[in-house]
Amino acid sequence: VYKRQIMDNTVLTAVPLFLFLGYLVERAGIVAKLFFAIRLASHRLPASMAVAALVTCALFSTATGIIGAVVTLMGLLAWPAMIRAGYDKKFASGVICSGGCLGILIPPSIMLIVYAVIAQLSPLRLFAAAIFPGLMLAGLYILYVIIRAYFNPSLAPKPAAEEIPPRAEILKEVLVSFVPLFSLIILVLGTILGGLATPAEAAAVGAFGALVLSYFYKSLKWKNFKESVFLTAKTSAMIMWLFVGSWTFASVFSYLGGHEVFEQFFKSMDIQPWQFLVITQIIIFLLGWPLEWTEILIIFVPIFLPLVEFFGVNPYFFAMLIALNLQTSFLTPPMAMSAYYLKGVQSRNVELMQIFRGIMPFLAIVIFAMVLMYMFPGIALWLPDTLFAE
């Protein structure tokens, strides 16, 4: 693994292109229109605004894999709207923080691209494997907020009847706001999973499509374009330098024989594959408290990869367990970065402990989703096995 050239790896060229796509969508105000349209369309559901926020987060996550961007934008857009509507602060905070973390799992995820490079796996199969787990987690979040608001309406009051526009206007908003962005997402993912384009090529098409959407919404301004380019360059540089530093540490660790010691320790324990999976996921969970996902992937995942083969675990299934597990690194106090992103944009309106309390139920849902996927591996493996059957 360590003999490969990293910085000229063609798969990594997709990272800045997907970032550019996400920042264009954000700066063009497309996400705000999307949230408004979904909020109107789901007004009959309990916690309709929370449902709209989670759906918007899931869709926006397909355009950008940067957690901070999603949580920050939704913290400025959806959180104040929910509070004005009478939503409980802890409940609203949990929705924004958990929904904003979906970008690390739902493809085309930057984390999955980096994982593909490290583990030498097919990014196409990883994307296919992540679709159903990502939808499952988003669906569990939505189901939770609906059930909780149904039994405790004070958490998320229903909108007044006079606030709901006619059906024709709702349909118009959905067609104008939801359909174009959803079509762009389907185009990007469809070309990747259909084998018509590499992730980098699909990202380039998506970035061009975002420019077209910005023009369509009359928000294609030089200021927005310049900010998108600057933020893309800044975030790409941050990711690449984290990559270089973490990879250097991992290379030295491997050269000094650290991997062999770790492997021999595990092999000497005489454990079953399921025990190996439980131990590794506990380790990843604990590492998520002090470390970013890049350090976890680049430093520790290469240690586990030979053991994955030794215990006969499907590498794509293992990757999906880690991807789900890394959700917890953004939700687990005291280093729950999503909470600090939200606190940063709403510092005067919510206490950090309120955010932490709101996050806890969603953290439990992530752990439940991991158990569910472990019990039913087909959630992750059916689609890639079907699409790429040899």
Language model regions located:
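Alpha-helical transmembrane segments of multi-pass membrane transport proteins
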Residues: K3-E390
